From Swiss-Prot:
Protein name as it appears in the record: DNA-directed RNA polymerase subunit beta'
A GO biological-process term: DNA-templated transcription
PANTHER family: DNA-DIRECTED RNA POLYMERASE, DNA-DIRECTED RNA POLYMERASE SUBUNIT BETA
Keywords: DNA-directed RNA polymerase, Magnesium, Metal-binding, Nucleotidyltransferase, Transcription, Transferase, Zinc
Amino acid sequence: MVDVNRFKSMQITLASPSKVRSWSYGEVKKPETINYRTLKPEREGLFDEVIFGPTKDWECACGKYKRIRYKGIVCDRCGVEVTRAKVRRERMGHIELKAPVSHIWYFKGIPSRMGLTLDMSPRALEEVIYFAAYVVIDPKDTPLEPKSLLTEREYREKLQEYGHGSFVAKMGAEAIQALLKRVDLAAEIAELKEELKSASGQKRIKAVRRLDVLDAFNKSGNKPEWMVLNILPVIPPDLRPMVQLDGGRFAASDLNDLYRRVINRNNRLARLLELNAPGIIVQNEKRMLQEAVDALIDNGRRGRPITGPGSRPLKSLSHMLKGKQGRFRQNLLGKRVDFSGRSVIAVGPTLKMYQCGVPREMAIELFKPFVMREIVAKEYAGNVKAAKRMVERGDERIWDILEEVIKEHPVLLNRAPTLHRLGIQAFEPVLIDGKALRLHPLVCEAYNADFDGDQMAIHVPLSEEAQAEARLLMLAAEHILNPKDGKPVVTPSQDMVLGNYYLTMEDAGREGEGMIFKDKDEAVMAYRNGYAHLHSRVGIAVDSMPNKPWKDNQRHKIMVTTVGKILFNDIMPEDLPYLQEPNNANLTEGTPDKYFLEPGQDIQEVIDGLEINVPFKKKNLGNIIAETFKRFRTTETSAFLDRLKDLGYYHSTLAGLTVGIADIPVIDNKAEIIDAAHHRVEEINKAFRRGLMTDDDRYVAVTTTWREAKEALEKRLIETQNPKNPIVMMMDSGARGNISNFSQLAGMRGLMAAPNGRIMELPILSNFREGLSVLEMFFSTHGARKGMTDTALKTADSGYLTRRLVDVAQDVIIREDDCGTDRGLLIRAITDGKEVTETLEERLQGRYTRKSVKHPETGEVLIGADQLITEDMARKIVDAGVEEVTIRSVFTCATRHGVCRHCYGINLATGDAVEVGEAVGTIAAQSIGEPGTQLTMRTFHTGGVASNTDITQGLPRIQEIFEARNPKGEAVITEVKGNVVEIEEDASTRTKKVYVQGKTGMGEYVVPFTARMKVEVGDEVNRGAALTEGSIQPKRLLEVRDTLSVETYLLAEVQKVYRSQGVEIGDKHVEVMVRQMLRKVRVMDPGDTDLLPGTLMDISDFTDANKDIVISGGIPATSRPVLMGITKASLETNSFLSAASFQETTRVLTDAAIRGKKDHLLGLKENVIIGKIIPAGTGMARYRNIEPQAMNEIEVIDHTEVSAEAVFTAEAE
């Protein structure tokens, strides 16, 4: 059998009239749809069975031939072929138009393709097509210009002047068709190329545009006259169905109405032509036909849209494709699936990390086919029908079978919005009572789920391959690290943190202090019987824990610890050191010696000499998990996480921490602090009234005063807090709340934002314990409302940003092992002024070196070229005092349509080298988009006079960077490398002038008077350096410097925004996105190549075009790099399917059709649209057609890491 989906590429072209006829199964001549009495399709109508096929399987219209045995026979009575009814989704008809009609996409689009081909303005075209003017087609011997327009009156005058038949002029689409037929593509192209050599300015731009379109026609084999239709295809009837509603009425697709209008007008025109009606009547009918076809193809593109009942515009063919509800985004990129369900989620604290609880009723419905198969196999029922009845009856025996069926059959759980790949994970189902899905508490963070009524969807993978993938690649227990930064995403939260915090507290003088136990069991027994407290410091024999990595001098001794810490260390992986202190030294280097008793030493003496340790907080638990993962990988880590969870829940229950109003302390000197602030504000206002400061200065001073007062209260609160206060414990452990919540409960609420976003000068002096006055309450509602609306707007903005990012990078896949490039990226720590945004150590981890790294003092080679830098290696490099390293980077990768493994480095989600087939583009887009909601919306005011411009931050700044827009608050940059020799202020024009002396000459830059300078006289500056504060315009930087410096700048800018909000994102994700913005070049001079000047093309295509020319000794083309925003880059992608499904569908398809574009289906989106397996992961060609070997040929090696993909592919075969 031929697999219809195994094709290499897909092409779109203009349809020639002969092509349309070859598709068609007959002409639709009548506007009728179905007979309202018999409900059968009318002959020669829009639903005719003769043309489109039978409405019932294997049955002709009159009923003479029924059953499959007559397959392929055409009925002699009704003329209907006996076949499947499904052909009504495939067979097309056609309408023979009695007058040519222009296709609105090619005449109306921007730029008008018809206009460019004919070198006529769109307005002139419109006048001709809609019968407002004549156009001269052939002037013969008259002095008329070809393509010139004549009004009705001028036409008559010219006819009288030159005589009938002395020239040819027509109106309507036929005139345009005649002109298009006369276009000599080769001659026009040669002429334009000649003109381009001398032209400049507007004239050149126009010539380049025309050349582009004419060249497209020339190369694609499309004929320009096909932009005018003589024959109209009719799409299959099942794609524009009529459905009977209850009540006898019909709901029909709008397309039927639009087709009916076309047929009616076409038939009327045919009759008028037969009757030889007067020209003006025929003309009017032709114009109406043109409008009817326009409405069918794209209703509302020209003039008022045609409306149906209730003045609703009808949905035309174009609208069927466009937008979120269009064919692309609604049905092709995402479909509804069966074997799925959704329900509210509840917590499942007893589940293992790879399990989820599925309600019985839900499971029986989801796994019905599997259960039925088993029933038949066990011979409880004779056939599938009986088995189905058994399941529906709820027979007792089905539950045991269900248990068997779901064993080892993973299911997928998804929570909307799915912001990153951790939004869908696989679990093994466990049957439970009730109606809610049970979710493991640790995976909540990845899903961003909580149990206040969230719902989740469940899906069943059906095929063996799908099950294998779910189990090997998507199991929740495997997803411990977050792909965006490589940090653990499954850290314990809330109660689990609190329990472990309480467990690891230490306290002096509690019962049992100084007791010595032989092992853990004895200590636990003492604690259970009330002889020792959880927090008491006691001794334990080191030898009772022989597997721990003790130092030699620590063995056979007694160690001081607490009962709680004995329990805490009991759940740790054996090879981790015994944890006494919540710091990295203890975790990586081992337990400090001070906790061990020397022989004969008194334990109480040692205890008294030790400081009381702080307990383990959320951050410390995160570090322990990361270390565990680094050493033992997933299996051990997920088991450890489950133990940590159980211990945390158990002890937070025992601790029984609660919050009462008495737990909120009263600050003793609150009144003094507030009085002092009032006094200071009064002084400021007095100074303002005397005219000693401006209103802006006064506002800043007042708000600063209140802010300082609030901070003073906060400081006092921290100084006086009791570490055993439950609120303090919750806050300190990181379980819930932070110091700002605490200070609003106990200190003062402070300054509030007014509805316009400006901070009000009147602070709220009360705190929640004292209670707010009515006025204070009213003030605080402004901020609360603003917070809610901001969040709602931000979510939509952030979602749209993610969609654009995914679209631009979806075809970036790891394609090969090593691209062999000789370029690299020199990196150092990213700084913002004096602050370090991202350290060199962070940037080095998990990357490959480009050159070897040497110790700056000793010259010893720390690491060779093209080696992977591990976490420890990165620390070693930084400790040696190295400040910059050249690494392999996505920016400089030479792989086409993707990235190679060495330029990418490790996969942050697994901590191992990335595998070929990983869809790194999508992961990068999700990693940047997912934290988008955490970024702020507002544009900050830097306060008062000092600000020259508002610096954009947060989400708007990220959008500004990725869309390559000109930034707000733009910095002035220098184009000269040299020294700043002078900065002169010109008071009359309120500007400053900066002079930079370079080798090639002096650069003079005018800077606004208020701008804050970044340079001083005598400073050395590089090309592209900013002279003033603010953001550099990247397009400008690209003109002054090279591509790499723009990429480096954009990377640093994105990181600044995210890091300032406390969000960490791996550099490589930003690199992938930024690289996609710089994939194109614009051809400046084509040299000896056949490229067109001004064309935008992919860097790799441009290099290819030049390669052949250089080899044959010709002059290569020159080009200039182009920086594109992500939206523009998505639309300029080589795949027209991907671009059309993103935005501006009609424009993309119009352009692709004229060029006869081929889509080679390299990206993920294109393959999803046509229903092929995506070319990433196990779907890559190299993993698919694998020949299985016999088992005895394969060498079996113990303890080898096998990639999940390899395992799966072998199973799939």
